[in-house]
Amino acid sequence: MSITQEFNLLSNRFRTFYPVVIDIETAGFNPKTDAVLEIALITLKMDKLGWLHKEDILHFHIKPFKGSIINSDAIAFNKIDPFNPLRGAISETLAIESILEKVNYGIKIQGCTRGIVVAHNAHFDHNFLMAAIQRVKIKNNPFHPFVTFDTAALSGLAVGQTVLAKACKAIGLSFDNNQAHSALYDSLQTANLFCKIVNRWKGLGGWPINVKKSKQNSY
């Protein structure tokens, strides 16, 4: 395998981390007490030329865990009725087990070592994901315990915007505000945004790194 081909592997792009786009809709801001209501996950892949693309999607409506808190302000914001039977909600345990099975498979197939959460304002989603994994008592958590890729920060650097809708529009993506705050829609837009930023950096010559050129242009 040539050096160029090696750089075009997903495992070599993010130092063996397997990027997984996550969006979580919740019934509040406290990951230990407030219910997770909806989770969407999108895996990513790199083509033979090293361009990043969306791959597979998982999407679950979640039943509030026993004893969890439902904040009225939160559900008024995301417009989720936690107890509507038409949601087709499943248990948090089943959702998390399905997610981790998918992530572990991707890590293995892509030759990576662990998953890394990609999210918009990633601290929020990462905290809720870690709390949910802890609640369902899964010991082998494939995700990095604290490192994330935050598209709010990345888009602030790339296009000068940190709000998801504004960042998408600034980079040339459409955004439907009527679909916002759905975990599925927001994860799709976050994945599109992340891929655009990564691919734009590559297109500008930022990846793969030219070590000699980087030393000459160092500040």
Curated annotation (Swiss-Prot):
Task: Give EC number(s), comma-separated.
Answer: 3.1.13.-
Which cofactors does it use?
Mg(2+)
Q: Name one Pfam family in it.
A: RNase_T
Positions of the site: Important for substrate binding and specificity? F29, F77, F124, F146
Binding positions (Mg(2+) 2): D23, E25, H181, D186
Q: Name one GO molecular function term.
A: magnesium ion binding
**UniProt xrefs under SMART domains:** EXOIII
Where, in this chain's numbering, is Mg(2+) 1 bound? D23
The record's free-text note on cofactor binding: Binds two Mg(2+) per subunit. The active form of the enzyme binds two Mg(2+) ions in its active site. The first Mg(2+) forms only one salt bridge with the protein.
Q: Which InterPro entries match?
A: Exonuclease_RNaseT/DNA_pol3 (IPR013520), RNase_T (IPR005987), RNaseH-like_sf (IPR012337), RNaseH_sf (IPR036397)
Any single Gene Ontology cellular-component annotation: cytosol
**Superkingdom, taxonomy of origin:** Bacteria
Q: What SUPFAM superfamilies does UniProt report for this protein, alphabetically?
A: Ribonuclease H-like
**Quaternary data:** Homodimer.
Q: Which HAMAP family does this one have?
A: RNase_T
**UniProt-recorded name of the protein:** Ribonuclease T
